[in-house]
């Protein structure tokens, strides 16, 4: 019997009553029988953004297989039609090999294409929403396959109309890419590449540097970690909390609670909606949660390389992960009156 601990990058979670792997087309054929009243269905990708309960899951878990990516001309763009089960990083590497560099800043992000669309991934100045053409979705309420456009996805910071929605399943989608190099739009990446912001660099240069940065933070899947880097922090869901957005008034109160000058441009930035995005890692550190912190006797800990990652040090349970995450959110809320929002999807759990 398959368990969530086997199919998730965090490596926790109970057994699954029924586990199925199938292509998107096979899923559409079988779906009406799966989405029956009283039966739980969960469709997963790479399991890189999922925290499941230690209790047995009584329903069906479906993992979609990948299929060949189809490439076609679309006027000023090249259209890549990609299945939901395709590895995101494999897609990045594939497009780079063909001379399309736009996805290179998002190298090394674990999980699948479907998960990337649902979670609205972004990294180092690039975002999946910026190149999205369409999303193919199975609607379990109507048993039909429908197409979502960019507006239908209602993208927000690390979220979309399809995140945490069980009756709509992403089958695949299209990206609209242009060949050639891409400008470096993120300060940390520009510094690492030793170039000015806006400089056009080859996708290979960008990818190599992004993978190195992620490896230094312990934020790469184990199989992508370059030789010589530590792999002890790879059992995680990446960043466990999203960076909170606060009002400018709240930011003023926050300044009085932290050391003078601590709230600089490296930990805050203006949000596109007029608020201020604050580094969740900064809030954790200011609340006393150092890298490597763990509750006594627990195998769940904060990564020794990145303050926002909760890692499984070996044999951790979902209960231990939630216990640590709960302690963090309560402490940050009490100290700064800021509620941290978890980034991963919870199955059978609440924080």
From Swiss-Prot:
<dbReference type="InterPro" id="IPR036318">
    <property type="entry name" value="FAD-bd_PCMH-like_sf"/>
</dbReference>
<dbReference type="InterPro" id="IPR016166">
    <property type="entry name" value="FAD-bd_PCMH"/>
</dbReference>
<comment type="similarity">
    <text>Belongs to the MurB family.</text>
</comment>
<keyword id="KW-0961">Cell wall biogenesis/degradation</keyword>
<comment type="function">
    <text>Cell wall formation.</text>
</comment>
<dbReference type="Pfam" id="PF01565">
    <property type="entry name" value="FAD_binding_4"/>
</dbReference>
<keyword id="KW-0285">Flavoprotein</keyword>
<dbReference type="InterPro" id="IPR011601">
    <property type="entry name" value="MurB_C"/>
</dbReference>
<keyword id="KW-0963">Cytoplasm</keyword>
<dbReference type="InterPro" id="IPR016167">
    <property type="entry name" value="FAD-bd_PCMH_sub1"/>
</dbReference>
<comment type="pathway">
    <text>Cell wall biogenesis; peptidoglycan biosynthesis.</text>
</comment>
<keyword id="KW-0132">Cell division</keyword>
<keyword id="KW-0521">NADP</keyword>
<protein>
    <recommendedName>
        <fullName>UDP-N-acetylenolpyruvoylglucosamine reductase</fullName>
        <ecNumber>1.3.1.98</ecNumber>
    </recommendedName>
</protein>
<feature type="domain" description="FAD-binding PCMH-type">
    <location>
        <begin position="11"/>
        <end position="213"/>
    </location>
</feature>
<dbReference type="GO" id="GO:0005829">
    <property type="term" value="C:cytosol"/>
</dbReference>
<dbReference type="InterPro" id="IPR006094">
    <property type="entry name" value="Oxid_FAD_bind_N"/>
</dbReference>
<keyword id="KW-0274">FAD</keyword>
<feature type="active site">
    <location>
        <position position="343"/>
    </location>
</feature>
<keyword id="KW-0560">Oxidoreductase</keyword>
<dbReference type="InterPro" id="IPR036635">
    <property type="entry name" value="MurB_C_sf"/>
</dbReference>
<dbReference type="GO" id="GO:0008762">
    <property type="term" value="F:UDP-N-acetylmuramate dehydrogenase activity"/>
</dbReference>
<keyword id="KW-0131">Cell cycle</keyword>
<feature type="active site">
    <location>
        <position position="158"/>
    </location>
</feature>
<dbReference type="GO" id="GO:0071949">
    <property type="term" value="F:FAD binding"/>
</dbReference>
<feature type="active site" description="Proton donor">
    <location>
        <position position="239"/>
    </location>
</feature>
<dbReference type="GO" id="GO:0051301">
    <property type="term" value="P:cell division"/>
</dbReference>
<dbReference type="Pfam" id="PF02873">
    <property type="entry name" value="MurB_C"/>
</dbReference>
<keyword id="KW-0573">Peptidoglycan synthesis</keyword>
<dbReference type="GO" id="GO:0008360">
    <property type="term" value="P:regulation of cell shape"/>
</dbReference>
<dbReference type="InterPro" id="IPR003170">
    <property type="entry name" value="MurB"/>
</dbReference>
<dbReference type="InterPro" id="IPR016169">
    <property type="entry name" value="FAD-bd_PCMH_sub2"/>
</dbReference>
<dbReference type="GO" id="GO:0071555">
    <property type="term" value="P:cell wall organization"/>
</dbReference>
<keyword id="KW-0133">Cell shape</keyword>
<dbReference type="GO" id="GO:0009252">
    <property type="term" value="P:peptidoglycan biosynthetic process"/>
</dbReference>
